[in-house]
């Protein structure tokens, strides 16, 4: 009997409302957890790389990844500086190869920080030219994107990258798929020298149609830089090919030996998408000159004459462009300069 009455009392406790005494807090449940404590947080303004236990190859890869993924401009710049120092060392420390470096850092051409873009150009100049040439087409894709960027500073720094690429891989730039006409289209967007507008020229010269350009808010220096790089691009495309020395076995080597250049049959476009005129390859000087005369000479000549009248830095840059255009005519036996 005693046990049954005890059980009844225990069950009744669950349904009894406890009486609260005035001035005393409510009784805490048995499973109460105190959450009133606070922990001290440590905030690090700048991340640091832990170099302990990492060899030079892993440290190189870590900095290469940080150069692309870091949120801070200073971090990306410092990581690029580390990679640049490793590439310029003697011997160079590059565990991922030139193609691995380019794949990672090419998107930084349009980076929003000027210091990052300047450091990126220094990195490009440390790469071996013979290893850059096979990737000229890939680099040009990012360069053309930077040439049509909304920021004038990005466009100017991109022209510096194109200037470097013309120095180390000029022939590959003008002869790769899309390297000739698509790059000229990008210059057209920057300068506003539209071939469709030039076709509607009047007897007075340049048409009065609106000039669709990406802006000249930085003054004549920006336009002069664009014209100078355009002149260098045209000089590279119109440069006569150097004759190859006579080799009696060259004929048989071309037939039976493996090619010494990457993708030697790219001009056939066996496995790629169909190309339009702008995406086509123009591997020799005569083909580039022919399509230039057909689509671009009138527009560039008209824009050049207008730029020469402005004088100053723009006029001097236009004079360099004029020499490049005249040189293309003089070296062509079928055309004469007036």
Curated annotation (Swiss-Prot):
GO cellular component entries:
nucleus; rixosome complex
Q: What is its main location?
A: nucleus
Could you tell me which InterPro entries the record lists for this protein? ARM-type_fold (IPR016024), Ipi1_N (IPR024679)
Q: Domain of life, per the record?
A: Eukaryota
Quote the subcellular location field of this record. Nucleus
Q: Which UniProt keywords apply?
A: Nucleus, Ribosome biogenesis, rRNA processing
Basic residues biased stretches: 1-10, 18-27
From the UniProt entry, list the residue stretches annotated as the region Disordered.
1-34
- The question of whether Nucleus is a record keyword is answered with yes
Biological process (GO) annotations?
A: rRNA processing
The answer to keyword Nucleus applying to this record is: yes
Q: How does it assemble?
A: Component of the RIX1 complex, composed of IPI1, RIX1/IPI2 and IPI3 in a 1:2:2 stoichiometry. The complex interacts (via RIX1) with MDN1 (via its hexameric AAA ATPase ring) and the pre-60S ribosome particles.
Q: What does this protein do?
A: Component of the RIX1 complex required for processing of ITS2 sequences from 35S pre-rRNA.
Give the matching PANTHER family: REGULATOR OF MICROTUBULE DYNAMICS PROTEIN, TESTIS-EXPRESSED PROTEIN 10
Family, as annotated: Belongs to the IPI1/TEX10 family.
What protein is this chain from?
Pre-rRNA-processing protein IPI1
Show the taxonomic lineage.
Eukaryota, Fungi, Dikarya, Ascomycota, Pezizomycotina
Name of the coding gene: IPI1
